[in-house]
Swiss-Prot record:
Alphabetized PANTHER family for the sequence: THIOREDOXIN-LIKE PROTEIN 1 (PTHR46115)
Disulfide bonding pattern of the chain: C118-C121
Mitochondrion among keywords: yes
Residues recorded as bearing Phosphoserine in the entry: S75
Residues annotated as domain Thioredoxin: 89-194
Record keyword Manganese present: no
Transit peptide: 1-42
GO function term, MF aspect, one: oxidoreductase activity, acting on a sulfur group of donors, disulfide as acceptor
UniProt-recorded name of the protein: Thioredoxin O1, mitochondrial
The organism's taxonomic lineage, starting at the top: Eukaryota, Viridiplantae, Streptophyta, Embryophyta, Tracheophyta
One Gene Ontology cellular component annotation held by this UniProt entry: mitochondrion
Amino acid sequence: MKGNWSIVRKVLHRQFSTLRSSTPSSRLSTSIRPLVLAPNSISSLIARNSLFTASNIGPSIDFNFSNTSLPHRRSLCSEAGGENGVVLVKSEEEFINAMSKAQDGSLPSVFYFTAAWCGPCRFISPVIVELSKQYPDVTTYKVDIDEGGISNTISKLNITAVPTLHFFKGGSKKGEVVGADVTKLKNLMEQLYK
């Protein structure tokens, strides 16, 4: 998707490079109007103004610039949670219930404290999903520290950085990993839950 944006940006740059800052705004607006009114014409502009031909790009480019012919890459976005054995905690009540299960010993658990803006969290999130599949008897809770009512409760746990992972077994906290240390995370999971 990023590649398509760079192509569109180059085409638009070529299209409007002849315009100067002294050009009246009406000329600029009439130059842009066809793109705004007919966004699907962008693929024809790309075909005329680049090394690509219409047959190379074809119908795979549409207004949202999705191109399904590109190879899939590992996403750097934090997983949404809820699938793959990771439980997304959305409220203070859900967090308290999950923590109660972990502390009464009925459920071995991992609490993954994260934030949407956190780069290392996005890096380690696929590893956590993989480990939750590898250890299906361990419940992994994903907790966004910026989520509405959860922040007050989390502040009592002294979470000073994200990602932070707390590991519970037998009713008590057995370990903690702060940061995106994949080796330490995998070793601690194996040590506690194998």
